[in-house]
């Protein structure tokens, strides 16, 4: 079947100031954009149209995969119509769609079938119909497993055969690479978060003289950085990303130097880093002072374009341009606040200092 559009999400799990390790989370997208898709007929053949060379006819002709409703057939440039078998007749119509494989990114293969059987990852014409793209010795047609055959048009009639090949998508990808990442920062607004209290500590001074106490507060703060990519992706393969990281902590959106990192499908964690603040607090006699650790977290969604490359078992590579959104939350700053001190005792109990 036509592969679903998947939403690829890369997550940063651990980091140092020098480098970051990437992991991936994959989720289905509601967006219908994918490189293998149907395009409405417009009187000409679109770029990337899927085709075969039919050498049985004379002269030989190029047949483009088309459909009318869910009925598969071939598109002819001779009359700019889709020819498909239906109702015992070879139908023709200009109201049709042509199958397009943008940038030839999907690795398409014809595989043997017989009497309604289908190889894995066969390409269907509609999500709700069990009709598949096929071809026989006489050209393109439709496979109907329920009827145990391939139908095709021949000399104006609908004909059938039990021997055929089905169009399939090769999903034996062993590696994916995303590079040439270009962020579109113009017009992007960094959402500056409100300062939030992460941790509190209270220091008491029951003595009769002022004391200075050192307070250290620490907190693990989770942030997230990811690339949402609108393209078909493959599960269970190693993926390499070469990209800089937009800095939203300072609201400047400056992009760091590019770094190359490997990641694997299946993770769904976020990054967690420990932050610490230390402050010296002068505490008056017989008083209690509260110290707070405050952090500000900024967010931004930055559109980007990139080149996505697949490597298949056997060494074949395909590539395409992709687009998406880089989503990030970053800690902008942490600091300590000392609140108004409160009285916890009576200084009258303290001996008066001698003159």
From Swiss-Prot:
Q: Give an example GO molecular function.
A: toxin activity
Sorted keywords for this record are:
Disulfide bond, Hydrolase, Secreted, Signal, Toxin
Q: Which SMART domains match?
A: DM9
**Pfam families the record matches:** DM9
UniProt xrefs under SUPFAM superfamilies: Aerolisin/ETX pore-forming domain
Highest taxon above the source species = Eukaryota
Its EC number(s): 3.4.-.-
Prosegment location in residue numbers: 19-27
Q: Which InterPro entries match?
A: DM9_repeat, Natterin_C
Query: Can you name a GO cellular component term?
Result: extracellular region
- Disulphide bond pairs: none
Q: How is it modified after translation?
A: Contains 4 disulfide bonds.
* Tissue expression per record: Expressed by the venom gland.
The listed locations are: Secreted
Gene3D superfamilies referenced in this protein's UniProt entry, alphabetically: Proaerolysin, chain A, domain 3
Activity regulation: the record says: Inhibited by tissue-kallikrein inhibitor TKI and trasylol. Plasma kallikrein inhibitor PKSI527 and classical inhibitors of serine-, metallo-, thiol- or aspartate-peptidases evokes a minor inhibition of the peptide digestion.
The reply on keyword Disulfide bond is yes
Renumbered to this chain, the signal peptide range is: 1-18
Q: Which family does it belong to?
A: Belongs to the natterin family.
Q: Give the function comment from the record.
A: Shows nociceptive, edema-inducing and kininogenase activity with release of kallidin from low molecular weight kininogen. The cleavage occurs at Met-Lys bonds.
Please give the name of this protein.
Answer: Natterin-1
Q: What is the source species?
A: Thalassophryne nattereri (Copper Joe toadfish)
Upper classification of the organism: Eukaryota, Metazoa, Chordata, Craniata, Vertebrata
């Amino acid at each position: 079947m036509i592969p679903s559009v998947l939403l690829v999400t890369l997550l940063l799990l651990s980091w140092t100031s020098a480098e970051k390790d990437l992991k991936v989370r994959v989720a289905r997208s509601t967006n219908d954009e994918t490189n293998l898709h149907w395009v409405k007929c417009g009187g000409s053949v679109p770029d990337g149209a899927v085709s075969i060379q039919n050498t049985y006819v004379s002269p030989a002709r190029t047949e483009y995969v088309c459909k009318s409703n869910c009925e598969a057939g071939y598109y002819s440039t001779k009359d700019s119509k889709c020819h498909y078998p239906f109702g015992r007749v070879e139908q023709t119509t200009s109201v049709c769609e042509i199958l397009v494989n943008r940038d030839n990114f999907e690795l398409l293969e014809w595989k043997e079938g017989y009497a309604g059987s289908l190889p894995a990852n066969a390409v269907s014409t509609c999500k709700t119909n069990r009709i598949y793209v096929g071809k026989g010795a006489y050209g393109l047609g439709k496979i109907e497993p329920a009827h145990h055959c391939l139908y095709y048009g021949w000399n104006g009639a609908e004909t059938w055969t039990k021997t055929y090949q089905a169009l399939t998508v090769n999903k034996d990808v062993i590696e994916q690479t995303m590079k040439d990442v270009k962020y579109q920062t113009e017009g992007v607004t960094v959402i500056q978060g409100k300062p939030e209290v992460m941790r509190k500590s209270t220091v008491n001074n029951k003595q009769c003289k002022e004391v200075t106490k050192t307070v250290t507060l620490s907190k693990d703060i989770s942030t997230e950085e990811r690339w949402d990519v609108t393209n078909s992706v493959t599960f269970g393969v190693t993926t390499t990303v070469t990209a800089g990281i937009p800095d939203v902590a300072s609201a400047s959106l400056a992009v760091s130097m590019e770094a190359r990192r490997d990641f694997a499908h299946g993770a769904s964690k976020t990054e967690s880093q420990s932050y610490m603040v230390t402050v010296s607090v002068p505490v008056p006699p017989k008083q209690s002072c509260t110290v707070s650790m405050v952090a500000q977290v900024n967010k931004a969604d930055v559109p980007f374009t990139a080149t996505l490359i697949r490597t298949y078992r056997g060494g074949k590579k395909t590539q395409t341009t992709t687009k998406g959104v880089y989503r990030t939350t970053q800690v902008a700053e942490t600091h300590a606040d000392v609140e108004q001190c409160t009285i916890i005792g009576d200084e009258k109990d303290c001996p008066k200092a001698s003159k």
